[in-house]
A protein has these predicted regions:
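Formylglycine-dependent
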Residues: 1-75, 83-92, 266-269
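Histidine-centered active-site microenvironments of extracellular/periplasmic hydrolases
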Residues: 89-106, 112, 119-179, 191
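Long, internal low-complexity/basic segments
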Residues: 260, 265-270, 274-353
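C-terminal cap/loop subdomain of S1 sulfatases and analogous C-terminal strand-loop tails that border
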Residues: 5-11, 140-163, 180-184, 188, ...
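Short, solvent-exposed turn/loop segments enriched in Gly/Ser/Thr/Pro and often Arg
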Residues: 7-8, 79-88, 134-142, 217, ...
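Non-transmembrane alpha-helical segments in soluble domains
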Residues: 64-68, 111, 118, 122, ...
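Short glycine/proline-rich turn/loop motifs
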Residues: 36-48, 93-98, 175-179, 278-281
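Loop/turn elements at helix/coil->beta-strand transitions in domains of secreted/extracellular proteins
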Residues: 1, 72-79, 126-132, 168-170, ...
Length: 353
């Protein structure tokens, strides 16, 4: 969770017109939870700005220590790390990048840690037996960003939360000395869910892949290693929340929402050639109308599969009730929720998505 000004009510002046407590600004919120399998979770550090910075420092320390422990025991391991890397509130006096924006400066610290991981793998003597993947987050939040932060659109349109390519397409690299040839540039489609299936295959753990649900990931081992030179995936369905927003097939894309004039007639203009129009600003009705039937068939097959294997329901309940070290203000969140539920004229559960 990224820290924004509203999450720190103590930084704001007293508002004499506030009628509710806590009102819109959260109180007692939990920033980070840590835990182990089979155990209850606990809050890490707290919710201060100092704790926000400490998340990455502690995560990096634990990542290196975990690698060292398993290398010493000659055991295979899997590590996933999603750094905070950008502090919205921390003053930044020194500009470490030529760009000078808050995001480019934050990349410098992240880049240093990536180098530390690669160096440690070599020091431990396991680089040739380890697949290392680094990839970006989808985003950034390009709509009305703070000035000077470099949260700007580049080649693709959109940002975090969008179904346009700027909100879903990210750069990535895979490094495996002796197994993946250097200096390759691959333009194939790989979905993040493919990493699950691919890692299971490379790690000899396919027998642990669940058989009681649909696994979206496609095995991309042959793309990474010598052999088949192309991805086993040429399509992707893109959602906004629980709404199917777009479908990509190869270089072509169909928008299902925001389809513009003519949509109600069944002839939508929202077909795009991503090679020619990466910003998805010039829909091509006439040149691409022959794709209409095929895209509609893809959507119907997808919807039919979801009827057989529906999405899991969202979790409901009192938040943070199981934390072993919950603060009084955190526990108050659950108590307040119960009071508000009891005061409602009817059950709110049936209105929850």
């Amino acid at each position: 969770m990224n820290a924004i000004l509203g999450m720190y009510p103590e930084l704001s002046p007293t508002d004499p017109y506030v009628m509710d407590s806590p009102g819109l600004r959260p109180e007692g919120w939990v920033m980070t939870i840590e835990g182990k399998k089979g155990e209850k979770g606990k809050e890490f550090c707290g919710s201060s700005n100092k704790c926000y910075d400490e998340i990455d420092n502690e995560s990096e320390r634990r990542t290196i220590a975990f690698m060292q422990k398993n290398a010493k025991a000659k055991k295979p391991f899997f590590v996933t790390y999603q750094p905070m890397w950008l502090n919205f509130l921390k003053p930044q006096a020194k500009k470490d990048s030529i760009n000078g924006g808050k995001i480019p400066n934050s990349y410098k610290k992240l880049d240093e840690f990536v180098g530390r991981v690669m160096k440690e793998l070599k020091t431990l003597g396991i680089a040739e037996n380890t697949l290392f993947v680094a990839m970006a987050d989808n985003g950034p939040m390009s709509h009305n960003p703070p000035p000077g932060w470099a949260m700007t659109e580049l080649m693709y349109r959109g940002g975090k939360g969008d179904f346009t390519e700027g909100g879903v397409r990210v750069p990535a690299l895979a490094w495996w000395p002796g197994m993946i040839d250097e200096k390759q540039l691959v333009g194939d489609i790989i979905h993040v869910s493919d990493l699950f299936t691919t890692f299971a295959r490379i790690g000899g753990a396919t027998k642990y892949i669940p058989r009681d649900r649909v696994i979206d990931g496609v095995d991309q081992t042959e793309l990474l290693l010598e052999g088949d030179s192309h991805s086993h995936r040429d399509y992707i369905h893109i959602y906004q929340g629980n709404v199917l927003a777009a479908t990509v097939k190869g270089r072509y894309k169909k928008h299902w929402i925001g389809v513009g004039e003519g949509a109600n007639s069944g002839i939508s203009a929202a077909y795009f050639d991503l090679f020619q129009d990466p910003k998805e600003k010039n829909p091509q009705l006439i040149p691409l109308i022959h794709f209409q039937g095929q895209f509609n068939a893809m959507r119907e097959r997808h919807n039919m599969m979801k009827k057989v294997y529906p999405d899991q329901e969202n979790g409901h309940g009192v938040p943070y009730a199981g934390l072993t070290n919950a603060r009084p203000e955190t526990l108050e969140i659950g108590k307040r929720l119960e009071r508000e539920k009891a005061a409602m004229p009817e059950s709110v559960r049936k209105y929850m998505p």
